[in-house]
Amino acid sequence: MKDIITRHKSGEHIGICSVCSAHPLVIEAALRFDLSTNNKVLIEATSNQVNQFGGYTGMQPADFRDFVYNIARTVGFPAERIILGGDHLGPNCWQDEPAAVAMEKSIDLIKAYVAAGFSKIHLDASMSCADDPVPLDPGVVAERAARLCQAAEETASDEQKRHLTYVIGTEVPVPGGEASTIGSVHVTRAQDAAATLETHEAAFRKLGLDAALERVIAIVVQPGVEFDHTQIIHYQPQEAKALSAWIESTPMVYEAHSTDYQTRQAYRALVRDHFAILKVGPALTFALREAIFALAQMENELIAPESRSRVMEVIDEVMLNEPGYWKKYYRPTWSQAMVDIHFSLSDRIRYYWPHPRIRQSVEKLIANLTDAKLPLGLISQYMPVQFERLSLNELNAEPHALILDKIQDVLRAYRYGCSSETA
């Protein structure tokens, strides 16, 4: 990470896409995408996804590391080119508990991530706990972030500290996506970014963390990008002009969250304007979902009814029976909720892919279509972009390969934005 930031600050057009997903096919797609390059691949876990208690994936930080490295071994991707990051590390999961308790758990969380070898740490203490005022005073936010940083510094070995980096900042979207529709988005003011840096610097120095300050590479801000279930707010460079100019006076860059579904030209403009770390998550699993739905249509054309995976029916039944991950996000009317379940840009379906019934049905879908030779015309009908790559001999007509390539369509847009080459 430090090398990428140094190159960006020296004037090179370079950024990095942060892959925020725990889905094995997404991680495989990301690693295969850069297998033949020298690029680093940044893969991040969030605190509610992976923590010392297991998170919703059931994985602790060391488990997630092993999970990623096992996929890398299968792919043949060198582990030294993987950067592991932790996102929203702080009291996010424990906001309903008293601050003292939540912070103790947050410190243990940070220690677990650093001990597992994660080298990019987002120190996020912005959320109010049960006995805190709302909103939290910026000084308290910085003070808590400094305590989290201190835990990381005490845990990291000297060798780890050579690669350890921190991200600070509080203006982040709701982890996991917006719960309601959005009309507009507030672009962070330059003076607010400056105040964030100033309060954090003071809090770090108060704890004797001067050396750690040198490891702070980015500030999280809102450049004016967001999405909800049905709409996307696209980047408007002129709105972020002052914010973009201010960061040039620091050794840091910006980290932008919720950059999913922006155009490839927007990613290029964001990196040009020093939003050099671009986080993406739902757009990747949205592409995965599109691929699986397309394959389900192909299966209906090719496979006898009694032998089909019925993946769409299984997904619907599981999500309707277990609505915990989508109920408070989607529209209440049944017909509208079904559209949201299937097609919402916030992609709450991503939480259900590990469900045993859904996982088994997806495996059967892939097995069915691997055994059946996929006709080119059928691929053209449901996956036209992949059909074009098949015609260019860039892709095999296998369901697994088609899914990965569909996910990589998203990564291609980020590569265009983050690379000095525009091909």
From Swiss-Prot:
Keyword field contains Ubl conjugation: no
InterPro entries linked to this entry: Aldolase_TIM (IPR013785), GatZ/KbaZ-like (IPR012062), GatZ_KbaZ_carbometab (IPR050303), TagBP_ald_GatZ (IPR023436)
Biological or metabolic pathway of the protein: Carbohydrate metabolism; D-tagatose 6-phosphate degradation; D-glyceraldehyde 3-phosphate and glycerone phosphate from D-tagatose 6-phosphate: step 2/2
CC terms in the record's Gene Ontology section: plasma membrane
Keywords: Galactitol metabolism
Record GO biological process: D-tagatose 6-phosphate catabolic process; galactitol metabolic process; phosphoenolpyruvate-dependent sugar phosphotransferase system
Family listed: Belongs to the GatZ/KbaZ family. GatZ subfamily.
Known partners and oligomeric status: Forms a complex with GatY.
Protein's recorded name: D-tagatose-1,6-bisphosphate aldolase subunit GatZ
